[in-house]
Amino acid sequence: MPGIVLIGAQWGDEGKGKATDLIGTKVDYVARFNGGNNAGHSVVVGDESYALHLLPSGIINPNLTPVIGNGVVVDPEVLFEEIDGLESRGIDCSHLKVSEAAHIIAPYHRTLDKVTERFLGKHKIGTTGRGIGPAYADKINRVGIRVHDLFNADHLHDKVEASLHQKNQMLVKLYNRRPIDVDQTTEELLKLGERLKPYVANTGLILNKALDEGKTVLFEGAQATMLDVDHGTYPFVTSSNPTAGGACTGTGVGPTRITRVVGVSKAYVTRVGEGPFPTELLDESGEWLRQQGHEFGVTTGRPRRCGWFDAVVNRYASQVNGLTDIVLTKLDVLAGLKEIPICVAYDVDGERHDDMPTDQAAFAAAKPIYETMPGWDEDISNCHSFDELPATCQAYVKRLEELSGCRISAIGTGPQRDHVIQINSLVD
């Protein structure tokens, strides 16, 4: 049975949670493979809306096993807050599996994230201040703390001491802050480890055995393609690999086990934080999209930057991820527009670029080249097949598919779980 990767094809907030939940009804395991609690996603079930930041969105489904892979950085405090919140609403979380090799976000990572961002001033990246970057930096610098380190007091103390040696020097001498106490930090982490222990497992082994047994595994990426530390709009990116390749390194499953790569794209584009955004709308059209689409961050509450659909970005996402399918979300938001622009290429210093510039200075200078499609007025939330959509809406979808270089296999037509038109199966 297949290993299916689900990733964001733009700058995040594309509706991956809803797409994951849709596909998740047909799979046995849902595994997050990157990021931390810096990305939020919402899952709507009936009249209930669940805002998740760290837990896989498949946690809502009692018939599958949710997994947090080794590529995720885990803030235990946030994890327990989410578990407690769900269990208070009757959602059982006891089937959650957390990789013993995942790295921990310690309190000092959050402190450093906030202090460093303020220190950068106008050069800030626009982080959420939740310690994600510093935790990944420790991982690369080989001074990180893994989940299994929380179960050995002496070993943990040594690792915390090693990690804080340089950080305390920076806090005191560079940022004029107090040093962080090693003993107190160790005690706090040991207590968190006690509660975390029942969920901890060798998740790489679990997922590989599941695939060997013919189970279907969905690999759920946080953030999105354009925020990938290698393939995104560097340096305005996250600290991990949300692209399809990250599913393998972030779970311990080999690339030959992946049979389908599904990208999620909004029918328009949004972005949170700093960085270039060629189709961004700074006028009333952008505010209209923001209000119609309720474009405010799940994690931070920040208003999202909004713009028209960027086909150059989607073609790039298709290439980088090897997309087999696209799930197009929030098509309903565009109802009421007389005309809908689509960015088909860029103008960079007078030259047309049909593909993504590798030079970020060129990308920052890119001006969108638009073609315009007629809009529609009808409410499409009750449409259950592609043929039921208004003719101009169908034409818009077909044009996006053509420009993206990948088939559109499902369409989101509203906020509810059943507001979806399935065109092609994403599992078979």
Curated annotation (Swiss-Prot):
Listed EC numbers: 6.3.4.4
Record-listed IMP binding positions: 13-16, 38-41, 128, 142, 223, 238, 302
Main location: cytoplasm
Location within or outside the cell: Cytoplasm
Keywords tagged on the record: Cytoplasm, GTP-binding, Ligase, Magnesium, Metal-binding, Nucleotide-binding, Purine biosynthesis
Reaction(s) this enzyme catalyzes, per UniProt: IMP + L-aspartate + GTP = N(6)-(1,2-dicarboxyethyl)-AMP + GDP + phosphate + 2 H(+)
Cofactor, how bound (note): Binds 1 Mg(2+) ion per subunit.
Cited Pfam families: Adenylsucc_synt
GO cellular component, one term: cytoplasm
Binding-site residues for Mg(2+), renumbered to this chain: 13, 40
Function: Plays an important role in the de novo pathway of purine nucleotide biosynthesis. Catalyzes the first committed step in the biosynthesis of AMP from IMP.
Subunit details: Homodimer.
Record protein name field: Adenylosuccinate synthetase
Organism: Bifidobacterium longum (strain NCC 2705)
Gene: purA
